[in-house]
Amino acid sequence: MLIYDSWNNDYKSPFGAVKRDESIRFTIKLSKDTKLDFAPVLVVFRTGFKERFLSMTQIDETDDCYVYSTIFSAKYSGVHYYYFSYTSNGTRFFIKKKDGHIGHINEGDLFQLTVHSNHYETPDFLKGGIMYQIFPDRFCKSGKLHQNIPSGRVIRDDWGGVPYYKPDENGHVWNNDYFGGDLEGIRSKLGYLSDLGVTCIYLNPIFESHENHRYNTADYMKVDPLLGTNEDFKKLCEDAKEYGISIILDGVFSHTGADSVYFNKFSRYDSIGAYNSKESPYYPWYTFYNYPNEYEAWWGIDTLPNVVETNPDYTKFICGDGGVLDYWIEQGAAGFRLDVADELPDQFLEDLNKCVKKHGKEKIVIGEVWEDASNKESYGVKRRYLLGHQLDSVMNYPFREAIISYIKGGNPNDFVLPVMTILENYPKPTIDVLMNFVSTHDIERAINHFGGENCDGKSKDWMAGRKLTEEQYAKGKNMLKSAFALMFFIAGVPSIYYGDEAGMQGYKDPFNRVCYMWGDEDNELIEFTRELGKIRKSSSAFKQGEMRFIYTDNDIMGFIRHGEDEDMLVFVNRSEHNRNIDSFLSMINDYSISVALRGLITDTGLNISAYDYAVVKCIK
C-alpha cells in the first residue's frame, strides 16, 4: 500500500513549490491494521524555527486503509521541511521520504517544500525560447581592424589552432593568446543563429580583461578592444533584436583582475589602484592580509583578487544608479548570468536583482549554481536564490548530469529522479526559464563525453588537439542527438554551447573553447538541431507546460508536456535499434486528434528510429 507520494496529486496538491499563503492539501493512507492512539499529524518547519503540528482528519476509507488529510499554507517564504507522525499503542512512528518521493515508516529523509514570494515573476522572453552560448574570442572573426589593443597579447593568425596551455618556467599559464573573434563577427552570424531558432545569446565575458577568458575584469565599463567597442555592443543588441534575439552578458562580480583599473597590480592604468595605495578609493573593496602582496583571492589565484561585495561603494558601483548594471542594460543587454553565484552574498544579490528589475520585468538574472539551487548551502549559509528576490534562473547542472548519465546507458530512474526532484523543488517561474545544457565553457563538450575516452586524470598534453576517430565521432554524434532531444523538450530552456550543433569537439578547458570551424561544419547535425527548434516553437506546451513522465524502459524515455489547447508527447530513443512502443495507442485513446510531428504512428504503435525521437501533438 502506498502511504504517501509527494509527486502524486492524490497525496499532495498542488505538486511542487508553492506561493506564500497558497493552500496545499496533504493526504496519507494508513493500514486499517494500524491502531491509532489519536489522529496523525503533519509536521512542518523551517530551519531554525519551531515545528508546526497540523492534525489530520479522516476523509475516506477503502477495504484496507484509512485516508487522512489536512490543509497547510505557509506564511513565510523559504525552504520548509515536513514529515508525518502518528502514535500507535504508545509508540510514535514517522513517515519520511525514501526513493526520492515515497513515504516510508521510520526511515528516510525529510520532504522538502519550497515556498516563494507570491509576486515572483520571471521574464516571458526566454520562455519557450532557445539560448546559444558564445565564447567571444572563438566564435567568429570579422576581420575588422581594432584599435588600442593592450600590450602583452599574442594575436594568433591560425584560426582553429590549439589554444596555448603550457605554463612558463615559473609554472604560470598566461592565457594571453587571442584568435580575434569579435562582436562584429557575432553580428554577422545572427541570420545563422536565427535559423537555428535561437532567441537569446549568452555571451561569456566581454569587458576589458587581460586573459582570453576575460573572467579577470579590468574595466567593467568598457568592451575589450579586441572584441570591439561599446558602440559595437549596442549595435549588436539592436540588430539581434531585429531577429527576435536578446543578449545576456556574463557578470563577474565576486572578483576583479589584479591587472585592472581597480587593483592595478602592474601599474598598467593611470588609476591609483588598491594595490598601489591604501588611500586608493578602491582599497576598501579588497581584503589584504599583509599589504600589498598578500590578499584574499578567488580560490587562492593571485590574478583574481576577491572583492568585498557588501562594501557600500562597490555595491553602488555595480548596482547603483548609473552603475555597471544600469549602463549595460541601457546599451541593450537583456540581463546577466552571474559567475560563481555562491560567492555573492544574499544582500548583494537582492540589490543586484532590484537594479536589474527596475528596467522592467523582462530583464533576467541567471546564476551559476552547480547543485540544487533551492536548498544550496554555501559557506555555512542556506541560500535564498529562488524565493523571488535574487535569481530568475540558474544553470541547470543537475539536468545535465541526468541527461549525460542516461544517454550513456544509465538506469532510467537515474534520469527521472533528478529531473523530478528539480521540478518538485524549484518554483514554476524558475522552471520555465531554467538554463538546460549538455556542454559549457567549464566542462568537456558532450560529443567528447559520449564518444571519446574518459579524460579524467589525463594531462593537457593528452587533450591538446586530440580528435575523435571516425568511429568515436559517429558514436558521440548519435548520442548527442538523443541528448539534444531531451534537452530541447524537457521543462526549461535549451542552451546550445557554440558549435555543439555543428559537431565541434574538445575535452576540458581550454580545448572546449576552440574556434568555430566555419566551412567544416557537420551540416546533418545542424539540420537535426534546426528541426528540434522548429518543433519546440510549434507548441505553447514547450513554453510553460507542466511535465510528467509517462513511459520508461531501458532505451526509451517518454514524457508529456501539457499545453492549454494541446498536449505534446515526447519519446527519446537512446539505443542503436529502431523501436516500436506497443502501448502508445492506449496512451492516445482520450484524444480526438493525434499527429506525429516526428516518428510514425502505425496500427501496432509508435515507431522511433535509432538515436532519434518522436513528438506527437495530441488534441482532446
Language-model segments: what does each one mean?
Residues 32, 603-620:
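C-terminal beta-strand-rich structural cap/linker in extracellular carbohydrate-active enzymes
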Residues 28, 134, 193, 203, ...:
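Conserved, mostly hydrophobic/aromatic
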